[in-house]
């Protein structure tokens, strides 16, 4: 396809118009008095949201050059969302401010590469200053609640639920968000290790009212192959039957003669027994069986390791305080594994999480980690309508990610104050030349933008409040919700340091690319050729 080539000011101005179009749509959502954005869809009802990245993702501009600018800032929002889970609006506002200030200087003759070097130096200094400002959250339930409430757009109910979930499962635990059947929003915590495999036969059920299998202090046999014949199982079944304890078999599958004999023995009351398929597939199944073995103090019976069912002894079986199984899930509570061995396994999984590049693998490793170290909490989000449900679920997701970020890297004063305080660190920063010094000044002015936007969304003059907050020190800032100047940390207005850091780094990265752009290539849309050839007339004599 033919390309239209734009150079210099024409290229950069087009990109800036796109940046402004997207940023202006996104920034109306910032702060406690930020407004909603309603997004029309070509099918279904409209979506109402206050989530910056949801707004950014929907924006496509008609002009191809402007659209390139918008897409670059969209990248800021989505990358910030991927890395920190929140702060997408802050990142967009910062990117717009850096681009605006930077292009003014480029138009006045500054060298774009020197400006970019100055911007990068300033960002590095601010990030170091944020690290000094950060305070550790640990397991402080109040701080977790405050962060979650702010990220959920000042919804204290959501904040409280997330704090409850964190208190129950700890920072290693997994918290997932699901849609509730009714209008109530609540937390459901699963104790112990749960995996998504139910009983292989309903005849194993011990509680007909709940249709569940409940086994107290059972032995647990872990086998990585299929069990089809009863003969294989007899060396295990006989000593277990003599002990009088129940038995749970977790294997690749149990079928044929083996399954039917187990069911008959269960119904006759000769054995308390149940069988489930092993969770996962392939290598992940082997790893999860090993996790269960470590948790329960058992051994995986695997021919790869030289073990067979025929030579399995009762000492090789795992133990747990309780096991409950329904048609979809198996939950093992209080496994008898040794704490040190479990801890080593947890550290091994953490190491794998750090080295893997796949988001999917990372998610699965996090789930395994939670099942071993913490637990699993499900946050059920309820609402009166589908539109409200989607909007609320977005906010809960944001709050959850922000809380994780806070636990990971600590917290700083919210409401744009932490960035404003970091300006002081730029005063001593040395530049190699005048344009680099200008780049540092660009960042110094741009980091006022989040506070300015929060104030303007609250209906006040941004410059006045920014000047007043700048006069103060420490955590002194402006509470837009109550229209007061307060100590931000004491008032519970806090941001995760990771969110602030990632927002600034991503904004500076994309802004630098726009400032150093000298040429833009755009597809030229081909004019539609006329319609096809007209239909010929019919043959003579035809109607």
From Swiss-Prot:
It comes from the Bacteria. Keywords: ATP-binding, Chaperone, Cytoplasm, Isomerase, Nucleotide-binding. Forms a cylinder of 14 subunits composed of two heptameric rings stacked back-to-back. Interacts with the co-chaperonin GroES. This is Chaperonin GroEL. InterPro entries: Chaperonin_Cpn60_CS, Cpn60/GroEL, Cpn60/GroEL/TCP-1, GroEL-like_apical_dom_sf, GROEL-like_equatorial_sf, TCP-1-like_intermed_sf. Together with its co-chaperonin GroES, plays an essential role in assisting protein folding. The GroEL-GroES system forms a nano-cage that allows encapsulation of the non-native substrate proteins and provides a physical environment optimized to promote and accelerate protein folding. The gene is groEL. It is found in: Cytoplasm. ATP binds at residues 29-32, 50, 86-90, 415, 495. Belongs to the chaperonin (HSP60) family. It catalyses: ATP + H2O + a folded polypeptide = ADP + phosphate + an unfolded polypeptide. Its EC number is 5.6.1.7. GO terms for cellular component: cytoplasm. GO terms for biological process: protein refolding. GO terms for molecular function: ATP binding; ATP-dependent protein folding chaperone; isomerase activity; unfolded protein binding.
